């Protein structure tokens, strides 16, 4: 769509032409960084407004002291409306927002579709507003990244700048939605794997600061989480902080494994959309009815734990539930909510809703931290630890474990709450959590799927270069296939027209049967008495290796190293020949990408 716009004569094409003539790409990148920050903050404000207004409309009349049967209805309605919107308006898959951004960077030259600039905002707004137990952050990250990608496509930026603009959009989304510019910056570094050099640092900072400033203008100065530090950190709480980090690591592992299992279950129902909607909707509605804290993002419930000072304050987290008024069940309620949140999130997305796992990880972390502190204090396992502080540190710990992003966890929580006085315990918890989860999972919840497919862009420059190459950039099509029944005399004629040292042998369906290695038959090709005696099928060899057209480039490079071949054929899933890759072109393309990535 963007390419077509740029090709058509008109205002946009003229603007791009004027820019190329009068403004350097470096200057234009800085301008676009500002625009991306502005638009990302507006998108975040719009999404939160949708969610807030829908929730006020639906739940403002609920009595806190009694349960409400409408909790059984609202989530199903929201998921159904979202499914209709995606099916008939968007007509594309917009789930897994951050994973989709990572996929675009590694395999699609950072190109995201135009509808991603708005579709996730609307879909997730409906889902969360009606009670879907997911987060708004991943849809906003996808939206911000799509804004950066589409602006980059309009102004025809190069591949490296496209990655940078996508990173600007993602960082602006996080910075704007949380009013946390440093967290937005390190999120791009840790989660999206965008390398920061002096050339890329400035545009991302511009986007983060711009998004933060406009978020203050649009949404006021109030922080997303209301926290006041009344009990400063003390050195004798270090053992508790370490144990909390380990606990958060195991909670993160449970979250990731349970999410993966639930996604697999709902994927099996893909052919039965209404069954999937009904089944997931019933699970979600039932959980929200039992535990209303699971309604929507759940940040209001986390704020109750952060602001509370007494049992009476914390009991408010059980409002609208069957547990309300039974303060002795508070710890049980907190534990059950922590355990069931992952199923509520999975049911929301699996049944057709739209949302991310960013907010659920913060929610689970907050509840897990409070649960840990209450158990510790009730059974007097050591020195007293303040529940509010450990709720905050639990949020950082679980987010670190789920995203493998300790700096994001530390700076986000510190910026959100102004809790810089808790910097050291935050670091202890995040490090302990990351060390624990890393024993079992080497990738974040966003990168896990791509890592298994060999499509994950990392900070390792060699692996990143291979990921960015892509199979299509090195496959050559200038081959001359021959039939297995072709006489040797005609084969010699084909050899004279070929510029390669091998000819692929294919059947009538185009399926690869073998190859003719010219270097192996050079000693007989001039013996005319053999021309009618031999056919291609008697002379062909099996290639030392065959490449799949969807094979990760790391595996392609490995096969060339193992076989020492000059060329290797490429086939599709049915064995049909699609071309070949030459060692010369492979290494030439690789060296060029490494040089581009290393250049400032």
Locate each region found by the language model.
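Post-kinase regulatory C-tail/linker adjacent to protein kinase catalytic domains
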Residues: 453, 536, 597-600
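The conserved cystathionine-beta-synthase
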Residues: 482-499, 506, 525-528, 546-573, ...
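Short hydrophobic beta-strand motif reused across regulatory alpha/beta modules
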Residues: 513-521, 580-587
